[in-house]
């Protein structure tokens, strides 16, 4: 998962892949990630300074399923596990995870083990929270202030601030001071590059729920 390769580890992994690409035969690396922008940023194959510059790769994009496709996906999965699950449960899972294949796979496996829808949701939110906190930790290496502002912007958008003005107002209210447009622009742009948000909306409903739980920090 590309989300786990933020920070110094990313360069080590890219160096290892580049070495294997040059010297090893019949070896394939598969990198996955729900944050498409982060995956592209990690590979960075168009940057001459990247260890993977110029290396061939093939990209497979798996889009969201429709509600019907999600339900059929879950039914087949439960059938393979020889588990009987009611249509109401299948519909609930399909609607909650909004057709995202990775979450549907996780949800099906967790429900098969626990038979508890609330546990399914909590497990997914905890995973999303862990990935968001990892992003914040990376930002904290640059500046605790920057990290705090990322948290605030994510929480503001998760709680309904769906325009530039509303996000800026929410950020300034929490900071207790005026924030320059360039600061917010950089944060929004980076979150969009990571495929976390677009047009002040979360692309992934689970990330939205996780971001609502981000804690406020005292100044």
Name the predicted role of every residue range.
Residues 9, 42-43, 74, 108, ...:
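Short, flexible helix/strand-to-coil boundary loops that buttress conserved ligand/catalytic motifs
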Residues 11, 15, 33, 91, ...:
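Non-catalytic, well-ordered alpha-helical scaffold segments
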Residues 42-95:
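Helix-loop-helix "sensor" segment of P-loop NTPases
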Residues 138-139, 146-219:
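C-terminal leucine-rich, beta-strand-based interaction scaffolds used for sensing/assembly
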Residues 1-37, 44:
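Conserved Walker B catalytic segment
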Residues 75-137:
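Amphipathic alpha-helical "lid/sensor" segments that cap RecA-like P-loop NTPase cores
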């Amino acid at each position: 998962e590309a989300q786990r390769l933020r920070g110094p580890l990313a360069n080590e992994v890219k160096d290892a892949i580049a070495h294997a690409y040059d010297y090893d035969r019949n070896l394939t690396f598969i990198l996955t990630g729900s944050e498409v922008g982060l995956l592209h940023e990690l590979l960075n194959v168009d940057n001459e300074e990247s260890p993977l510059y110029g290396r061939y790769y093939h990209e497979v994009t798996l889009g969201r399923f429709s509600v019907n496709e999600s339900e059929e996906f879950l039914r087949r999965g439960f059938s393979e596990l020889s588990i009987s699950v009611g249509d109401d449960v299948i519909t609930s899972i399909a609607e909650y995870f909004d057709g995202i294949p990775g979450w549907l796979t996780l949800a099906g496996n967790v429900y098969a083990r626990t038979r508890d829808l609330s546990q399914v949701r909590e497990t997914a939110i905890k995973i999303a929270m862990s990935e968001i906190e990892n992003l914040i930790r990376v930002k904290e290496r640059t500046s605790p202030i920057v990290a705090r502002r990322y948290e605030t912007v994510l929480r503001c958008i998760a709680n309904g601030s769906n325009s530039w003005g509303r996000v800026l107002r929410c950020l300034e209210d929490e900071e207790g001071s005026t924030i320059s447009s360039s600061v917010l622009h950089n944060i929004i742009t980076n979150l969009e590059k990571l495929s976390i948000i677009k047009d002040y909306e979360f692309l992934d409903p689970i990330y939205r729920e996780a971001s609502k739980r981000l804690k406020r920090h005292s100044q």
